[in-house]
Amino acid sequence: MKVLIQRVSHASVVVEGQTIGAIDKGLLLFVGIEKTDSTETLERMANKVLAYRVFSDDEGKMNLNVQQIGGGVLSISQFTLAADTQKGLRPSFSCAAPPAEAQALYDKFVNLLKAKHSPIATGEFAADMKVSLLNDGPVTFMLTM
């Protein structure tokens, strides 16, 4: 599982001209589900995302997590994160979970986030999405499990 997290001032996602998810200050997640991912992987990643300290405290040190600042989370499924880019000039998606399995795992991941934090907004699995964001920093991390 790979999750690219970005600290944002605000972010939104549009599908077919309609805004379907938006947050103010918080985290934008791009989530790639791989063949080897399990429920345990999802639980560990959800906990890590919510506890990851990327927001500044009063001394300017990245010492606060999204829950501590009352921020939002916008989660976007992105199978291209599971690409193998080691060889050639075209990515291979052999490590990505098959679509039906990936959707079930992604939905479970979102539900784990929702059980622990609010607000959680999402895009639409496998849709052509337009994601807008205002990076804060920029602060971006790739989390892998």
From Swiss-Prot:
CDD domains: Dtyr_deacylase (cd00563). A motif (Gly-cisPro motif, important for rejection of L-amino acids) lies at residues 137-138. GO terms for biological process: D-amino acid catabolic process. GO terms for cellular component: cytoplasm. It is found in: Cytoplasm. It holds the Pfam family Tyr_Deacylase. One of its GO terms (molecular function) is D-tyrosyl-tRNA(Tyr) deacylase activity. SUPFAM superfamilies: DTD-like. InterPro entries: Daa-tRNA_deacyls_DTD (IPR003732), DTD-like_sf (IPR023509). Its EC number is 3.1.1.96. It catalyses: glycyl-tRNA(Ala) + H2O = tRNA(Ala) + glycine + H(+); a D-aminoacyl-tRNA + H2O = a tRNA + a D-alpha-amino acid + H(+). Its main location: cytoplasm. An aminoacyl-tRNA editing enzyme that deacylates mischarged D-aminoacyl-tRNAs. Also deacylates mischarged glycyl-tRNA(Ala), protecting cells against glycine mischarging by AlaRS. Acts via tRNA-based rather than protein-based catalysis; rejects L-amino acids rather than detecting D-amino acids in the active site. By recycling D-aminoacyl-tRNA to D-amino acids and free tRNA molecules, this enzyme counteracts the toxicity associated with the formation of D-aminoacyl-tRNA entities in vivo and helps enforce protein L-homochirality. Belongs to the DTD family. Homodimer. A Gly-cisPro motif from one monomer fits into the active site of the other monomer to allow specific chiral rejection of L-amino acids. This is D-aminoacyl-tRNA deacylase. It comes from Saccharophagus degradans (strain 2-40 / ATCC 43961 / DSM 17024).
